[in-house]
Structures are given as structure tokens and as C-alpha cells.
Amino acid sequence: MALRGPMKRSHLRQVSAPSVDSLSVPQSQSPEALYNDEHSHQDVHATPDERTIRLSSASLERRQCSLWVHDETFSREEILFNQAAFSDLRVNVGDVIEILPVRSPGDSIHSLKSDLGARSLRDSYLESGSAHLPDPMSKFKTPLQSRCLFVVKPLPQEIKARHPKLEISVTHSVANIFGFKNRTLVNISVVDRGQCSASHVDIAFRDQFLVRSDMWRLVMSELADKIIYKGQKIVFMGSIKATVKNIFIRGKKVLSGYFSPHTIPVFRSESAKYVLFIQMSREMWDFDSEGTGDILFSRVINGFLPELFKRWANSDAKHLVTIVLFTRVEYGSSALGDPLPLSSESLRCISSPNHVPTRDFYRVVVNDMASGHWTTILDELKKDFRTFLRDVSILKMDSPDTPTVDGVKVAPKNKPAIIAGRPSTALRGNILEAIHLASAHLAYDHIDRDMVHTGTSIIVITPGSGVFEVSYESLSSTSEALADRGIAIDLVCLSPMPLHSVPLFKYKAPVERSGSSSFGDFHSSGYSPEMRQSFSFASRTPHLSPKSTMQGSFPGMTHKEHLSARSNEWNYGIPHWLDISYWNPETYREARRIAKKDPNAPIPFTVTKQSKLFVPRVRMYEIQMMGVMESEQSDISIPYLLEGQGVSRTSNAGLGLSPSGLSSSRASFRRNSSYKAQLSDSLRPEPFLQSITNPKDVMLAKSKKTPNQVIAWMDQYDEAVFQPFAKRRQQRKASRPKRPSEPEVQVSNAHERLSARSVLRLREHETNSNSGDRSYPTRTIPRVSETSLSAPQGPVPSKTSSPKKPALKAPSAARTPRMSRTISFALLGFGATPPRAQASTEVNVEHARAQPTSGQKKPSVGFMDTRSVESFSGSDSASISTVIDTSLRPASPHPAPQKSAMTPTRPISIKVPPRQPSEDTEPVDRTVLPESYSTTSTAIPFTGDGRRDSRTKNGPRFELTVSGGSRESSIKSPQNKALAPWVRSINPCNTSRDVLRDTSWFGRWQHAYPRPPHVAVVKWKSLKSPAILPLTTEEFPTAQELGSDYLQTPYRVFPNDDPEGVEVPKTRGILLREMISLRLSHGFQIVIGKHVAEASGQPALETLNVFDTRSLERDGATVFLSKGNTIHRLICVDGGEIEVTRFTHRTSSTLAAGKRDDFSLYTPAMRTILSTEYELKNIKLDPTAEDYNWNYADNYVAGHRDYLFNPAQQLQFWRVRYVLIPMPLQVNNRRHLQSFNEDNEEEIHLLGINQLTHIWQRHRYVPPEEKRFESSNEKKDQNPLNIMYQTRNPSEVVAAELDRILLSDPGLDNSPAQLLPESELLERSSISLSSLAQIIQGEKGVRMMDRRWHWRLHYNCFIGFEFTTWLLQNFRDIDSREEAVQFGNELMKHGLFQHVEKRHNFRDGNYFYQISSEYRVARPESRGSWFPQKKSDKTVPSTAASENPRDSPVNGHSRSDSVETLPPHMPATPSKSKNKATIMLSKMMKYDVDPRKRSNRPEVIDLHYDRLHNPDNCFHIELSWMNTTPKLIEDTVLSWAATAEKFGLKLVQVPIAEGCAISRTQPFRKPYRVSLTVPPPPGPVPTVFNTATFSQLGSSDRHYYHKAMLRKFDFVLDFEARSAFPADVEVSYSWGTPDYQYPQYIHRSGSLLVQITDEGDFLFLANRLVSTRLAAATREGSRYERMDRPEHLRARASTYDPLDRISPRLSPLVRPLHDIGSPISPQGQPSIDSAHLYRAPEHILKSFEEFCNDAARLEQFYSVSHARPVSTKVGPAPTTLMDSSIPTLELPASVVSHHIHPPALMSRASVDGSIPSIDAMTRARNDSLSYKGSPKSGSLRPLNMT
């Protein structure tokens, strides 16, 4: 966060400040003492006691010893310390020891030179790692910075015995960090922990997703109460890895420190998501006249962005980058015609003076591209820049009835277009809308969670200077959204830094108005010169101040309503959430020269004589034409405005205001120019011009005074200015009516000059002044400069107006012109004013002296009420601020004659504030008299402080308002109150240093800054690795505000003592820790500090140790957490309960409640990556209100879960979705899976899924109570998950067998095996084949049914894994599935049963077996269903009772929510509706992602998996969790991916929602539509069949050819559309109801999704969730998986372990670009990087689109596809060959059981045939020799793209 305000220290001072302590100082003064003296103002958090701590150890007892350096073979301890060798130091175990190298006397001087000379260069270089530096100690030369700290541990006895002379030894890594060498002499001393406690610690991490609760737990576990050092590697739970980057003690970087309870950890992500916005405003095309002459955009493309990308590369950061060009285009009425030929939606009419319609444009250049490919990013950016201005200038006329497709307006192709409009200036751009759009997707951050990136940072690059004109609604909405989401915004300005506080938002707050709105008020606001940018020379027409230039972004209010809802005064605010930087290419050009050791490069940061003359930044066109700046020789002395001091109020007692006492000098305008023209251009407000009736009134009188009189008058004035406060207070008491008084000229304290006279007077009166006068704040008003802040914007409230509401319109008869802009340099010593035109510093005060109303006393002097507001100049040089003083109370009752409304000019008066930094704070209860202001004054009295007293208990408030009343009245405004927590109102021209150092200045981010940052430099640390929202904050309202402005909602939570609870916390302490963790992961911060201690009356909260949960668990312990407008208080009460009180700000819920709908709709024109033109989008910009049900969430954490029907959606669980895509097996895979070489690829794919189910079953979470129940079971193995495999799509299965099935059958939750009574359990030694055959085929035997696989129907068969489970459950002497498989093979050898194709042994899997004919029992009917018949006597063994939270181990089976248990052979009766059956296509189980128990809590997720699967399609997995560690989930997924990959399955993360809905959550993305040039003919009628019959029924498939095309291009089915299922069936999944509008397919690479619309178009969407970043972790996942795989796959058929090989690259497995047609490169290994991964979807799409646009190829494809026999397959087919072309061929088993799989590129042989129906298994064997793709393999061969 930038340090706001005029903190204009020299660049030398800014850079070298941290090295002050390395300066050479006298021996009597330690370097640390010098540091404390110089940097005490930076220690924001230190108490006075802490500031006085001596950091040096000079007074401690030291011992000199020899330091050894050892390696890990000597000892694994980092530091070995022989306690016995230092008995004289009385060292105890647990003491903190300091190691300092023995320095020579000249070291300190040498360190000064080396540090000052190289500090800046090494600053960023060191951050990339100390290993890159030749001298890592270059920045840490002082004892404080370079000392090595450690905690004493006992020395191992064996080392002590072997090396008795060892005193202290460190490892090589520690020695390298601290610069120690072996056998060097060091000083050893014991230090106090308080002296070495770190204030902040920067911790960096990458390639992992960490929630803030994990960061909190990491600190508690690995850092709290320990010594840390720079570069230290942190490993938490063996998986989460981080590195200590920087350690700060009192604002200084050190090499080591103690992590105390009050140390603030700052986590920084080196793998974040960056959204770069480049504001393409009008100035982007302006030339840099003072620099290189390039346009400003060149600074972006050739300067800033390459520098940013290089720093990313140097730090090895791995970010994802999205770049968006945005602008606001203004259209003139002349170009559009009258009336406007546009619909009301197409353009927005902003209530600017000339009613200019605008439209916002966004051009997405790249989306989520890896930062390492920055050359590609810059190339794309250059291409888009060439056409950007042309594209946004073409306005296409829309009609109101423009059709919309997928929520986007699609206009006809031949709509008319005109060239109109021009980009607005940066000041009036759409920056807030852009930021709001970028942060909108964070509202859905819990869905489709990226598991390798943490944090989102927005960088806005603007050509402006950091000043923006916005509307109150957009500022409030954006601020609220950003406060809730905890996102960081960086603003990078290309223009030089202005002379005022930045970043600055100016807005007009809505006010309550009674009666009708008058358009006359609109004109009273006057001109707004700050709207005119100095570099926009093309526009010289005057502009009126807009009521709000951006409120038009929220259509819904008419223009008249806009006018009536705005006040006429500007408010100025600085947001907490914006960090500003200024890019100066010259600075970094010199730095590069220094880095390259250019001999001509300047010595860094040394004071050199300024070689070029001062160049003024004033860019007033009129002044330039007068030649004043070139030829004026007059001088002026301006006193310093002391830094950090406010401008005090002064009283002009005794100073006459009669015309005789004023200088009546008059200067003429240029004779050949019109007076009105000269004043009209940003010099005078419009009301002033309208009030001029006589041109002579504008002319200024010549001076009639002698120089001596002028000097005497100035001396008299100075006496009044610098008199003591005591006299002023008396004068204030005597003054009653308020009068405007004389003007002042003040300059920013960055460019200060002080005359000798002023210095003497200043010192004299500073010593004599009192420290009192708290009753009047500093008041300043905007100065007028050329492109800067406007002249005062409205009349002062009249005597009769209410002090709490500004009078928006003064009586026109009494109005006088506000101010003359004619200025004179004629001061002392130069005689009379020169007769030519004057333009510099003399100010006409005709508007400062107002005409008093009748009946009012006419004082001659008024009290000076000044407030300076800074220039909005876009340049970086000084400009003089003209301040109009408004009299608050007259000092004397002398009447002031009123001779004319035009008053003469007055010489410049200059005041200097006394040293009263915080003594003039205004009390809250101050009142304002009704006669405060004169009716006729047109100058605005600015009320409020220039800074905030940090001790006040009224919370953040507006210190700067522009209403006529007091500050208190403005604070009470509900609008200002609502905005105050996020945007701080200030006086931007003279912001006090005390205000700038206020800790609450940075809002929620205050703890992210170890020391106050500077505005003028680029915040590279934030730009390189954004900080995560700190865990703690000190922002808290006062007790009064908490009671009056917040709604309270209390409730209590207690742990669930139900023994059947799932992962339920058993104690209150564990529950409290989980509740705090849940809030931290949702963006809350723990509140500490004095504000919460004072508000709650609990002093202990000020020093709360947030890393000690034991102290938080005691009775009465209180924890406050805050987020935005919400505060939670957790109190541990008696009885083991936790009382939660939610405080919700009243204003946030009530402000604009009725208007929010009107303002929410935003309609920009957006062009995504592949779009050819801009399209209008309707986007809601509502801030996401806190609608989270914390009561439900806390009770869910506590174990009370029966009341939630869908907790994943109700409580916003984190959710991710994966698919297993079938891939062709490579030769290497075949070699490593020798035991399965007789299987075809389809069977191996099913084996892979079966392997995963075994892992899931083994690691499913079982509550302790259920574990005890299962331990009573003698069986040692669990059942595999019952997944039904089909060769048809789910919709076809449901439609064909609806009369027999109900997929939510409880029997499907577990194995269908029937348990025999205990007395009837069998034994292998006492069973005969005939009796076993009878039992198997009996009622309690294995399930027999007719099963179809592809085209072949197998009668009366059972499945291998069901029979394995039956054997395990019914044989007393079989204890594992391996034994059951072995016994099954024995039975098969004896002829009990056989494989249906006689080609497999018995296996535990989806293999079909039939009882041999000699043992077969005649059956009355065959159970011809794929699904089980219900039996009331069925007893099912327990698998995972936790699959349903309400299941109990006692039941023995899981209950279904939708269907009751039915009698046998009865049809299913739906429970919800008599006409609709409910079918559940997936199931959920609780899965333990921490089987090794590395975490201190249960780590459980909900695992959803398909229960019905077609091997040709994707297998779906969805994970959801609430409070689980994401890194453990990622490790688990890696292990699954490594396992699946060995079986030809690729695990890919895909979006949960369908592709066409991406724009709802990600506004910068949109599906790409591809249409067929030649419409396809009607498709053939599909073959519909059930278990026993075939029939051709139904209508033709209108998407038959579309699906065939997708099969051709290697797409597999992901999800079917909801309309594909029968209308009378209610289909649902365990994660929710499917709501896909269109069927969705996914490319085998996983990188591209496609949907088929109802119109027959294709919608393509790149899958950006695919990441090659996971590849690096595959090897670890393989090791992790190897430890946990089931025993029955360990070297069954070979001694070679197929899982011991190194797994190839994890998903995605994308082809190289030169071989985009094949799923895998010919070498069988993936050879693609993230750049190719990013481009792969575009290349696939390009080839597909070319095919769709080739009419000849389409016609040929239609004819070939139609000639084939009709297949029932809706999913992807395995090959382009017809199924009927495969002949029948029986081969010996020796031939079938081949060992070598054919190469992928040799599988194109074609064999003719015409048999319509054939055994699929036989065809698979044929494929083994003919190299044809298997019909079951799901397009397993690469397809020809032609």
C-alpha cells in the first residue's frame, strides 16, 4: 500500500534509509542507537518501551570462541553448541545465543561505502535468493542485521565424546547465509528474546494452494516461539513447503530473529493469478514530449512489462497472467445524430454537462497464460494495440430487438456501422468497473479451485497520474466487494507523480433532497478544471463538472434523478485497498546500466549536481502564450510548509479589509483577446462568467500603493498570522459572524523555500505559541491550477440555511464572481506591477470578500479557514496552490464597506503553521452557528480536519467533506459512514504526517507492511509476489459505534457428543480452533491491538497471542474476527460451549437497498481472445453481501448435520471436479503390466478404475465408533465399490431399463453378495463342487443375470468382483480378496464355471463368468436386468456407513433418502412422485486424505464417484470439503493420477459447470461458436434395445453427424444434456441435479471442451484448469501411491513391480504442436510445455473449424458416415471403421495372450466384413492381430484429422 500524501523525500533518502545504521558514528553512540533516533517514526507498532530497547549487545557479556562448520554426515543438527565450554556465561538450555563475527576496527567504515554504493542494485537481486550473490552479507553489515541467533539445545553425548574441544559448530547452509567460515573467531553472548523479536516475517511459497487457516496452523506449528533465519526452509505436515524471505526488526531487514507471539507473518505467493488491466485512455496515444518522444503505450510494452516479467523470471515465480485492455469511449451527439439511433441498452448516458453517451470496452489479450512465456504475451499485446483504437471507434447500431444467444447480444451480420467516439481521459475512465469485473469471479472462488495457485492480484496500468473521477455508487460497490474478498490492487501510473496525495478518487456523495430537482443547481457547480488533462491538447472546449462521470455505469436512474441525487461538492478519498506506484523508465534505464557495469553509468544514489534547469510542470495554455514562464524575472520567497505539521487557523485581528488597506492594482488582459474567452478555459467557474455584465468589471486596477506601504501591510499581516494561540482563542470568542477573508498561497512541502524574514518570525512564534486550541481543525480548500482541482464548486450556505446541509444554490442576485486568476509577481522591491498581463502568483480576492447580507454586522476581518487540496496536474513539477480563505468568525466588528462586487487584488500573504501536530484536533461535539457563512460568498468552506486523531474513538470518518456544515454533520451522513471503512477522506494537498503514519491508514492490509512504503517508487515486492491478506488486523470500531451502528446476532455452539458423529471435534478447544480456521479461510482476520481492547474493555486483547490456542480455550477467553462490515465475537463460556455474536453494520444492509437493483446492471462491450468483434454483455456488479449462514456452518463443524440437505452448496464447500479420460496404452505400459497382457485396452481401463476403488475403500474415513464395530468383524478386507459398467450412455440405460431399475437401490450401495448365517458359513476343505454350485445359484448365492456387453448378450452370468466378495463373506477360512481369487481359480480349474469367452482366468473385476453346463441349475426365468432385484432378506456387509451421515453400523446397510425398502420382485415406487422415478447416478463417500496422520485434526473430504460408467466415456470424480487442508487433497489426487496413468487413464481437472455457462462466473471468458458450412442430413434412426431384444424405435438423432465429427477429432463424452434423459425420470447425482443444457465432450488431451447446441453449432471452451505444473509432483505422487496400493497387485504375475517405474507426466498429457493429431507423441512420452498447453486448444480448434468450413470434406464425411450401419453408441466410437466390417475369428488362447501391443501409429488396417452382430470379446481378440481399434476402447487409436 502506498504511503499517501506528500511524502516527497529525496530519492537518496528513500533508498538509503534502511542503511542508516551502517553509517560511521562515534564510538560512544552505537549504530543501533542512531537507528532508533532516525527511524523511530517508522516503528508503527512499537510501544515507547520497545523503542528504547538497545538493540546492540555491547553491554552483554561476550565470549570469543572458534566456530566450526560441519556437514550432515557429522550431524543433522543445524547448530551444535557445547554448553560446558561456556560455563562462565551461565548458559541454560532454552536461552537465545547471539553469534557475531569478530570484526576489525575498519569494518564499519567499509560497510558504509559498500552498503550505500550497492544497496539499491542488490535489493531486488537478493530477494531471488542469497545463493546468487557473491557476498550475501552485503546488506547485513551491522551487528543487528548480520547476527546469528539460535536456541541452546543439549549437545549429543557421542559428539561431545568424540570432539571434546568443539565449542560451536554450524552446518554449511547456515554458514553460507551468515558468511561464516570454518575456524573463524566469533563472539558469543546471551541475548534477551525481547531484543531480537521480529516484527514482521516474509514467508514465500509456490506451486500450492494454501488457505489462510493453513498459514495460521503452519505458524503455530513451525514458527511460533522459535528462532528463524533468512532462507530457512519450512515444511509443514511433510507436504506444505515455504521459505523465509525477509525478517524485520523495527523496520530493518535482519538475517535472523525470534518469532515472538507478536510477530506478524506475511505470506507471499510466488504462484498467483495476475490480472493486468491496461487503461487505453486518450493519453496512451500522446507523445512523451519531454522524454524519448515515444507514445505512452511504449512505456508499457517496452519498459514496465518487460521489467516485470524479468523480475518474475529472476525470482522463479510461476504466475498465471490475464491481460485486458480497457477504455471508455465518449460519443458526441453530432456523430450519433439526433435522436440517437441507438437502443437504450447500447450506450449509457452519463449525467455530464453535455450529456455525453459512453460505452466501456474490454479486450482480453491473454487469459491464464503462464508468466514464463512473456515473449508470447508481449507479441499478443503488440498485435492488439495496433487495432484497438480502430475496433473501439467502430460503432455498430443495435436495434432493441437484437437477438441474444447464451446471454450475449448477437447482432445481424449486415448491421450498419459508423466511426464515432474517442477514448476518454484517464481521469474519467472506467477503472472501478474494470477492477470490480476482475474481482467478480472471486465470489465463486470456492468452485473449480485451482490447486497449484494461491492469491489473485490485480495490476492496473494507467497513463494518468493516479486521480480518478468516479461515482459514489461505483466506489462504494467496488470497495465493499474488495473488502469482502481480500484482494490486492496495484496501480501503476505512467505519468509523473503529482504534488498531492495519491491515489485519489473524487466523487460526489448522494444527498437527500426535498422537493423537485432544479437544473439550475447543475450550473452552480461551475467548471472543473481538473477534468482537463494537460496533455490533451486536442480538446480545448470547456467542460462542466460532471455530477458523476461514472454513475452511468449503473443504468436505471434517469438523468433528472441523477441530478437530484448528487451534491454539488466534490469529496476526495483515498482507498485502503489500492497500492500505487509510478513507473519512471529513466530510473530503471540507469539501473540496468549500473547492473551491466557500464563505466559511464552514474554512481548509484549519490548526490550529483542537477545538470538541467528546472522545468515547470504547469501547463496552462494561456500562461504559455503570455510568455510569462520564459521572461518573468520577478522573484518570490515562499516559506516552508513543515512536514508533518497541519496548517493552523489564523485570525486577522486588526487587519483592515477596507479598500484603502488593500492593493488595488489592476492588470489588463491581452488586448487582442476576449475577456470571456480568456477566463472560460479552466480559469473561472461558469457562474462567474454568467455574472459578468460589464467587461470593465473584470479588469484589475493598477496599484496605487508604494512598495513601502505594501511591505508595511505585509508586516502587519504577518503579525496577525504568527501571533500566539492564546490571543487567537480570545479573538475567536469575540468573533460571531463569519466573513470571507484574504487568500493564501501555499505550496506542497516537497518544494519548499523559506525567506529569512519568515524563518525569524516562524521561530519566534513557534517558541511563544501554546499547545492548546483543540477546537478548530486545519481547514484548507482546493487550490486552482491549470489542469488541477477545480475552483470552489458552490456557494457558501446562507445565514438562513441549515448548517447540516449545504445550500446548493445561492441567490443569483447576490452572486459575485468567485476568483480572478490574474496573478502578479510584483512584490517587495520591484515597484509597481508591470503594465503587461500578469499570470503568476497574485490572486484576485474578489470572491473571498463576499457581500454581507442586510442586517448583519460587517466585520473587517474574518478568521482564516483554509484547506488546501492538491492539484490534479498530470505532471510532476510544482504548481502554486491558490487557497481561498473563508472567514469562520469575524475578529472585529468594524464594518466593511461594500462599494462593488468586484474587489481589488491583494498582495500575496504567506503563512507557516506552527508545530502543532495533533493539538488542534476538533472535538466531536462542536457546533456551527447558523450565521456561519455569508450568503453571497461563492467560495466553498471546506470543513473537517486535514488529518485524523488516532486516539479518537469514533472510528474512521471523513476528515474532508465539502458540505457547508461541520464535519460532524458530514460524518453522520449514512453514505459517508458506509464508505468510511474503506475509503478515507483527506485533504490531499497537505496531509499530515501523523495521519500518514496512522496504522489504520492501510485498512485490512496494515500488517502487511513492515515499514511504511513510499509512493514514488515501484512496489516490486507486491508486483512480484503478492501478499496474502494478513491473519491479523487492528481495524475495529469504537464501543459506541459497535453498539449503535451494528446489528447483533448471538447464538451458541457446542460439540456434538453423538458417538456416531463423523470427524466431530471432541472438545471445546478443538471446536474453537476449527471455527477460527473456517473464518480465516473465508477472509476473516483476527482483531488485535488497542482499538479492540478499548472497545471491548478487555486489555488482554491488545497483546493477544493468536498463535497459542491454549490461551484461547480458557473460560471467558474472547476472540474477535472481522471481515468488511461483519465482526464475529467468539467467547468460551461455561459448560463447554462457545458463544458467537455476529455484528453486522447497519449501513451496509440498508444503504441504497432500494436502489441496488437499479445500479447493478453493467453493460460493457467485451471481446474475448478468439472473438472477432465486441459484443455487449449484461453483468451484475453487486457486491457479494455476507449471506453465509454462519450458524449452520458452526453447527456443521460441531457435528450437528441432520438439518442440512445439501451442505456442499448451502455452506459453500470448496469443490473440484476431475475426469478420467481413457487413453491408448503405450508399449511401455504394456511391458510394465505383463500380468494383464491378455486384456484389451478397455479391460485395462476398467482395471484402473477398479484399482482406484480399492484405494478409495482402503482410505475411506471411518469414525472411531464404526471402527470398533468393524474390528468385531473377522474379515480383514473391505468390499470394492459397486460400480456398474455399461457400454451405453447413462441416458440410454435409464430409458431402456426404467421398468426394472432404481439406481438409488440400497443394495447398490454395497456388494450384492448374500450373507449366510454364521452356522452355515462354508469352509474350503469341506465343500463339494455340486453343493457349492447349488448354493451359488440359490437364493443366497451370487447374483446371476443376463448381461450385455456392446453387441453380445451373455446369459445367466455373474461378475468376478461380486463372486470374490461372496466368497470372502461366506467362507470362514477366506480372509482376503487375494485368497478368494486364488480359491476361485481352483474352482475354475475343476470346471465349476468358465469365462464367457473362455479367455480369462478368474479375476476380481468386471469379468463375466457362467456356471458350467454340468453344474447349471434350471431357472424358471432369467433375471435379465443390469440392476439387482430387491430382496427383503438381504443382509449386506458394511462398506462405509459414513457414505450417508445418518447411517449407523447397526443397520448393516445404507438407507436411501428417496426410496423405501420394497418386498422382493416388486417394482420400485418413487417416494417423491407417483409419476416420477428417482435415479441416483453417483454416490458419495467420506475419504481420509491423511492416512499417515500428519495433521493434528481429521482431514476428510466428500468423494463423489460415478455408479454407472461406460468405458468409452469419462469417469467422473468430484471432491468437496469444508475445512480440510488443500495440500493434502492435492497429494491424494497426485497419487490417484499416478495410479490411473499406469492403466491408460488420464486424470484431468475440468470445470464443474458446463462450458456455455463460463461467462456467469468469469466475465472475461466466452465459448467460441463454430457452425457447419453445410448442414448435415437427417441422422439414421438409432437402435434401441433392452437386455433381451433389439428394436429400431424413436426418432432420428439430429446430432448424429455432430457426434461422429467429435469422435473423428478425438473427443469423448463428458456429460449428457438434461434433456437426453426421459422426462418421467428424475435423474440426480450425489453432488446435485445435472443442469447441463447441452451435451459436453472433452478432448483426450483434456485441454478443450465442446458442446453441441440445439441449433447444431459447436461451442468450444479451453480448459484452463489443466496445468503441467502438476507434472513435477508426479514422481512424489508415485512414491506416495506405492506405499498405499493394495496387496493383490504387488507382483502377481511377475517379480517386476509395474508401479515402481517413474510415472510420466501427469495430466494433462498434451501432444506437441507438430503432432497435434495424435494424443501422444510417437515416442510415447509427453513432450509439451505450458506454452504449448496454452496453445493446444487453439490448434485443435483451428483444425476442427477448417473442417467445418470445408464443404467438400463435410459432404464426403456425411456420405461415409451415413453408409455405415447404425450403432447404438452415442459416445465416442473407437474407430472410423464400421462395426459390421469386423469378421468373426476364433483364435487359440496362446495367440490371444500376446505380450506386445502394436504401435499406436500402425492401427489403421481395415478389414471388410458384413456381419451385423458379433461377439465383442471376439472382435477384441481380432483387434490384437489386425491392429484395429477395439469397440470398447473408446477411440483408443489416433484418428486422422483429415
Curated annotation (Swiss-Prot):
A GO biological process held by the record: positive regulation of autophagy
Name of this chain's protein: Vacuolar membrane-associated protein iml1
Intracellular or extracellular location(s): Vacuole membrane
Source domain of life: Eukaryota
Keyword presence, Cytoplasm: no
GO molecular function, one term: GTPase activator activity
Region Disordered, residue ranges: 1-49, 728-817, 887-976, 1422-1475, 1822-1842
Biased composition (Basic residues): 1-12, 728-738
Membrane topology: Peripheral membrane protein
Family: Belongs to the IML1 family.
Record's compositionally biased regions (Low complexity): 797-814
InterPro entries in the record: DEP_dom (IPR000591), DEPDC5_CTD (IPR045838), IML1 (IPR027244), IML1_N (IPR048255), WH-like_DNA-bd_sf (IPR036388), WH_DNA-bd_sf (IPR036390)
Comp. bias (Polar residues): 16-31, 963-976
A GO cellular component annotation in the UniProt record: GATOR1 complex
Annotated keywords: Membrane, Vacuole
Compositionally biased intervals (Basic and acidic residues): 36-49, 750-767
DEP domain location: 1338-1413
